[in-house]
Amino acid sequence: MSYKSDIEIARAANKLPIQEIGAKLGMKNDDLLPYGHDKAKVSQEFINSVQGNEDGKLVLVTAINPTPAGEGKTTTTVGLGDGLNRIGKNAMICIREASLGPNFGMKGGAAGGGMAQVVPMEEMNLHFTGDFHAITSAHSLLSAMIDNHIYWGNEQEIDIRRVAWRRVVDMNDRALRQITASLGGVSNGFPRETGFDITVASEVMAILCLANDLKDLEKRLGDIIVAYRRDKTPVYCRDIKAEGAMTVLLKDAMQPNLVQTLENNPAFVHGGPFANIAHGCNSVIATKTALKVADYVVTEAGFGADLGAEKFMNIKCRKAGIAPSAVVVVATVRAMKMNGGVAKADLGAENVEAVKNGCANLGRHIENVKSFGVPAVVAINHFVTDTDAEINAVKEYVASHGVEAILSRHWELGSEGSAPLAEKVVELVEGGGANFGPLYPDEMPLFEKIETIAKRIYRADEVLADAKIRNQLKEWEEAGYGHLPVCMAKTQYSFSTDPNLRGAPTGHSVPVREVRLSAGAGFIVVVCGEIMTMPGLPRTPAAESICLNEEGLIEGLF
């Protein structure tokens, strides 16, 4: 049986005018700032007007460690939202925006897939409403103002060897990881080493996604540490006087984007920090607004539960004062096989034994999710190559962990295929079994926070960090930053820092290569192993297959 591509399905969607989608949430036409007919920004006035409403229930969708192609977490998020609406619940979804770089590299789009998509899919995976361009521009403005400050006399006495603020671009470009700037003569400034990160790794992105309003945004931007003086005292963004202009550039980007699913259910798509190099959750302002206008809000956190869900619980929920009522762990038969040692080329063939071996990875994620005090259900995201024997093997394993696994066919059937999952989620939420608590208290020393995550979530034996890193953490504690949560930057493919170490490894070590203080965002980034904050393109990038056809339509984009 042949299936339409995601882009063919999205183009055939029967979209409603965005004003009709907003009306489902109590929004009047004046509450929306339309970008065409099918997407809009939500006004700050509307957001302010619903603050007195009672909060709905929050459901987190996370996953096992992914295969390189991803496991359909966004697809499941969309499918579950549609499924909840199908069974009579007032539900909406909150997901992240797509980064251009990975879309032209190897990752799937950020709009779901099959019959569980958010539309307009093409625009969402490209420029959308321009939020990422605004973030890149605000970040770049600060970069320019730092070098300009140094050029015109360096009143703040910045040590040009200790400029912490790098540049960003929303593209996978390994050639820019490490560069020398200001070459070409005296008129171009003082030459120094710097580099580029991808926009989704920018602290500006993290700040936008954690800020409560424009006032909070401007304060957080001012708190960014951009450099250090020779006496090692920090230079802040506010010392460069950049936070006001940066806020102006981000004014519209702070407003959540409203779009719709294929089944005309509302969706907020806002913000997009990566989960392997940042905190991996959509914006606080979108999630908290959704909770005021819907009874059920389904959101996702990037990559596996060891990264996205851990940061959702320890960073986003802690900072935003929210708590999930249930967690859905997405698993696929093919990922079980890969974690069980099967090569990517052989994933289509039945291999029940490999599925059983790979289930240890799923079991670890279930244990970790439950350790936060939140009830869980496993969603088996169905693929046409899955066999009954393989599916039953997953169900039996999950049952042994005291959790139910539901086969969900939302990719193929939309809400009809996800209704059983939706029913189970409602059962968990209404059962009132959630007693959420983060993994560590604010007052725990920073290095102990790192060890807590490494040992309790990754099941490592030890954290390897040299004296320089440990001393840096102590200095930050003495400077008043010891209460901040830690944001682990590591590979998404394994519980360890080795992407090839599949399954549920124990007894491994977590090497810390670098620590970065994101004072504006409000967390410490802990860079582990070989993770890069600027990805590269694969040998055959997806961009090679993307073009416009004779009708002016995009081809090759999913």
From Swiss-Prot:
One GO biological process this protein is involved in is: tetrahydrofolate interconversion
Tell me which stretches of the chain form a coiled coil.
Answer: none
Pathway assigned in UniProt: One-carbon metabolism; tetrahydrofolate interconversion
Q: What is this protein called?
A: Formate--tetrahydrofolate ligase
Q: Which residues bind ATP?
A: T67, P68, A69, G70, E71, G72, K73, T74
| Reactions catalysed, as given in the entry | (6S)-5,6,7,8-tetrahydrofolate + formate + ATP = (6R)-10-formyltetrahydrofolate + ADP + phosphate
Kindly give the CDD domains that the UniProt entry links to this protein: FTHFS (cd00477)
Please indicate which superkingdom the organism of origin belongs to: Bacteria
Gene it is expressed from: fhs
What's its EC? 6.3.4.3
- Any keyword ATP-binding? yes
Q: Which GO terms describe its molecular function?
A: ATP binding; formate-tetrahydrofolate ligase activity
Question: Which UniProt keywords are present, listed alphabetically?
Answer: ATP-binding, Ligase, Nucleotide-binding, One-carbon metabolism
Q: Which family does it belong to?
A: Belongs to the formate--tetrahydrofolate ligase family.
Q: Read off the HAMAP family from this record.
A: FTHFS (MF_01543)
